[in-house]
């Protein structure tokens, strides 16, 4: 019954015809094959041996493609067949023979590229046509790391990262597979092949040579590795993409702007270590350092020495807070003088008490010479003829110690009662004796040195009365 049904359906003749064609191809294959010698008698170097093996395999593949004798491996040795794919006319384009032929052609292309580099001047087989495009798939580990947005990292802000990868590698990179298309997109909005969700998420890399394919795979792998290995929040690639996106949207807040307080970069104004606080405005009057008062000062320097730099009064030995005592004229308006007022301040320079009645923190030494000296003011006689007498009207004598005044040897004309000599009147000076030195020195004409008369007259030149 089964043989009869096969004859009715016409399958018996088809199977016989198929077997006849296979036998014919086998006989033709033996004639077409130009077998290269497999036994090499002469010595060859390692490079020559490698080149010969490549040439042998290229010739073998060319003969198989030319004879159309594609021997599909057994079911145990071949991979599972992919789902069938049909073209616009309804013909299947991914049969086992077609897939095997495509595999052989790719192998021959790689071998021709290697041999052309090893052997200069090598000519490929006549039926060989170099493919214009190559493509490869790089699968992304979405199932292992579902929390990472690989598509966003590969695309970048408005596709800038993907375009940069394509420019650097020289190939075309497209994201395909499940999860590569946003919801709401249709096939009319996307390029052909983008709606194919049969494969998992992957990068489709297309180029004109193998080197560019490898560069594209390496670029995609680097981004995936960086996204997987970087801790959360420390991915520099993602930070750069967010910054570029803010620049494109016009919402970027520049982080490299200098601080308004110190003018340096790297921190905000509220994080500035040099910002002025309330404590920085307080200046210690002892050490002139900001941040504390005199009570909290830990400086070992002398208070009396540091107080001279006070901005209130550099001459006061203590810190004075009241300014009313510096204005004695304020009391004169009311016609009275306060008690213990000496004209400049209600406290003497040698006072041991401050304004608040407390004793001085640092005692000041008293003047040692104040009790042992006498202050004496001398009013010299005025004279309108001498400049020296005019200057002495404003001169006051310093203190002279009583115990040492007797031991001093005063010059002539100076006594203890009148320490400053009287002014000299040069009009009263008389010449008693004018004599020349011993020797033969002669006086000028008209001058007689031997005459001791005080009425000496000088004679002028001849002709002058």
Swiss-Prot record:
Gene3D superfamilies: 6.10.140.1790, K Homology domain, type 1 (3.30.1370.10), Zinc finger, CCHC-type (4.10.60.10). Residues 339-361, 377-391 have a biased composition (Polar residues). InterPro entries: BBP-like, KH_1_KHDC4/BBP-like, KH_dom, KH_dom_type_1_sf, SF1-HH, SF1-HH_sf, Znf_CCHC, Znf_CCHC_sf. Coiled coil: none annotated. A zinc finger (CCHC-type) spans 257-274, 282-299. Keywords: Metal-binding, mRNA processing, mRNA splicing, Nucleus, Repeat, RNA-binding, Spliceosome, Zinc, Zinc-finger. One of its GO terms (molecular function) is zinc ion binding. GO terms for cellular component: commitment complex; cytosol. Disulfide bonds: none annotated. Residues 1-22, 324-391, 431-465 are annotated as: Disordered. Its main location: nucleus. One of its GO terms (biological process) is mRNA splicing, via spliceosome. The keyword RNA-binding applies. The keyword Zinc-finger applies. Residues 1-11 have a biased composition (Basic and acidic residues). Residues 139-205 form the KH domain. Belongs to the BBP/SF1 family. Necessary for the splicing of pre-mRNA. Has a role in the recognition of the branch site (5'-UACUAAC-3'), the pyrimidine tract and the 3'-splice site at the 3'-end of introns. PANTHER family: RNA-BINDING PROTEIN RELATED, SPLICING FACTOR 1. This is Branchpoint-bridging protein. It comes from Candida glabrata (strain ATCC 2001 / BCRC 20586 / JCM 3761 / NBRC 0622 / NRRL Y-65 / CBS 138) (Yeast).
């Amino acid at each position: 019954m089964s043989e009869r049904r096969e004859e009715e359906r016409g399958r018996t003749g088809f199977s016989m015809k198929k077997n006849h064609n296979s036998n014919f191809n086998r006989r033709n294959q033996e004639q077409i094959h130009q077998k290269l010698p497999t036994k090499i008698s002469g010595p060859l170097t390692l490079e020559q041996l490698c080149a010969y093996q490549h040439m042998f395999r290229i010739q073998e593949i060319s003969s198989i493609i030319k004879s159309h004798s594609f021997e599909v491996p057994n079911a145990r040795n071949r991979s599972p067949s992919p789902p069938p794919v049909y073209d616009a006319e309804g013909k299947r384009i991914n049969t086992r023979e077609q897939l095997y032929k495509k595999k052989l052609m790719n192998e021959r292309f790689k071998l021709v590229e290697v041999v052309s580099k090893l052997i200069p001047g090598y000519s490929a087989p006549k039926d060989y046509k170099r493919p214009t495009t190559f493509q490869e798939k790089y699968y992304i580990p979405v199932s292992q790391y579902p929390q990472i947005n690989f598509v966003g990292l590969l695309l970048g802000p408005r596709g800038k990262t993907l375009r940069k990868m394509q420019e650097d590698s020289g190939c075309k990179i497209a994201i395909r597979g499940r999860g590569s298309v946003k919801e709401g997109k249709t096939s009319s909005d996307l390029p052909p092949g983008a709606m194919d969700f049969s494969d998992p998420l992957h990068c489709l890399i297309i180029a004109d040579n193998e080197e560019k394919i490898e560069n594209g795979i390496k670029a995609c792998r680097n981004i995936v590795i960086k996204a997987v290995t970087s801790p959360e929040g420390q991915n520099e690639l993602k930070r750069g993409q967010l910054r570029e996106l803010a620049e494109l949207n016009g919402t970027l807040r520049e982080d490299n702007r200098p601080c308004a307080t110190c003018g340096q970069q790297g921190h905000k104004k509220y994080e500035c270590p040099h910002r002025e606080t309330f404590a920085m405005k307080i200046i210690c009057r002892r050490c002139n350092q900001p941040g504390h008062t005199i009570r909290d000062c830990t400086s070992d320097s002398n208070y009396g020495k540091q107080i001279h730099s006070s901005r209130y009064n550099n001459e006061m030995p203590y810190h004075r807070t009241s300014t009313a005592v510096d204005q004695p004229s304020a009391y004169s308006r009311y016609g009275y003088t306060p008690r213990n007022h000496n004209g400049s301040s209600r406290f003497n320079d040698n006072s041991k008490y401050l304004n608040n009645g407390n004793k001085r923190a640092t005692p000041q030494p008293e003047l040692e010479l104040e009790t042992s000296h006498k202050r004496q003011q001398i009013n010299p006689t005025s004279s309108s003829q001498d400049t020296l007498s005019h200057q002495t009207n404003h001169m006051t004598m310093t203190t002279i110690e009583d115990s040492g005044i007797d031991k001093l040897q005063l010059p002539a004309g100076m006594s203890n009662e009148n320490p400053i000599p009287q002014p000299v009147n040069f009009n009263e000076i008389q010449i008693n004796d004018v004599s020349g030195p011993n020797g033969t020195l002669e006086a000028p004409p008209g001058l007689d040195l031997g005459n001791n008369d005080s009425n000496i007259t000088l004679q002028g030149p001849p002709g002058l009365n």
